[in-house]
Curated annotation (Swiss-Prot):
Family per similarity comment: Belongs to the bacterial ribosomal protein bS18 family.
Coiled-coil residue spans: none
GO molecular function, one term: small ribosomal subunit rRNA binding
GO BP terms in the entry: translation
Species whose genome carries this gene: Mesomycoplasma hyopneumoniae (strain 7448)
Name used for this protein in its record: Small ribosomal subunit protein bS18
Role of this protein: Binds as a heterodimer with protein bS6 to the central domain of the 16S rRNA, where it helps stabilize the platform of the 30S subunit.
Pfam families registered for this protein in UniProt: Ribosomal_S18 (PF01084)
NCBIfam families xrefs: S18
Transmembrane stretches, start-end: none
Keyword annotations from UniProtKB, A to Z: Ribonucleoprotein, Ribosomal protein, RNA-binding, rRNA-binding
Subunit structure: Part of the 30S ribosomal subunit. Forms a tight heterodimer with protein bS6.
GO CC terms in record: cytosolic small ribosomal subunit
């Protein structure tokens, strides 16, 4: 790729660092669902903008929430229970 046309992307700031949150609660489903895609997978930090420390804590919180059945293991898109007009 020609360097002349290379796009420079600015890294998104970590939402947890900005809010000065040290603990990501696995019972806070509204926060955790923002970081899960329609397939039920955890979104990577390059998309969400999380730093490495908070991405690890987020992954642990999502896994704990799945284990106690607060979050599904698979998303609505795989089950077919999603709004097909949004895709």
């Amino acid at each position: 790729m020609n360097k002349k046309y290379a796009k420079k992307f600015k890294k998104k700031p970590c939402q947890f660092c900005e809010a000065k949150l040290f603990y990501i609660d696995y019972k806070d489903i509204e926060v955790l669902q923002r970081f899960i895609n329609t397939f039920g997978k955890i979104q990577p930090s390059r998309i969400t903008g999380n730093c490495a420390k908070h991405q690890r804590k987020l992954a642990l919180a999502v896994k704990r929430a799945r284990f106690v059945a607060l979050l599904p293991f698979i998303g609505d898109r795989i089950r077919g229970n999603y709004d097909k007009t949004r895709v």
